[in-house]
Amino acid sequence: MTARIICVGNRYATSDDFGPRVYDCLAAMSIPADVDVLDGGLGGLDLLRHLEDGRRVVFVDAVSGFTHQDGIILLSAAEVANQCVSGFDHVAGLPYLLKLMPAVLDSPPPPVTVIGHEGVASVQTVNAAARLALRLATEDAADAC
């Protein structure tokens, strides 16, 4: 089984480019063989296929309403899924995916942690988030949140 770090967001929108920037940072690092790092981009529900057999999943995404500017926050899948207030549409994003996850996976959902950031992240914050994602992906704990 492999752990996965899935960085999501829109690299062309500064309010949503946290995940892609962390992905770029991780791509320049030495990653253990049992950790997959994916640029989830705006993959939406297509990302469900990466949750089927992962030992652990760490999502990295921009968030809103959770923390102060330039702060990193750790959230559980349930905390993010609870932000889904409507059905599926163009802006449903990660909350909808995590809300739907338990209902559509053939196997039990993997442990999921979301590394979130609000606002435009500094280079230092992006680097810290990349290191945190790697640490969370390789630890044995059931859930960091």
Feature names for model-found ranges:
Residues 1-145:
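N-terminal catalytic or cofactor-binding beta/alpha core of small enzyme domains
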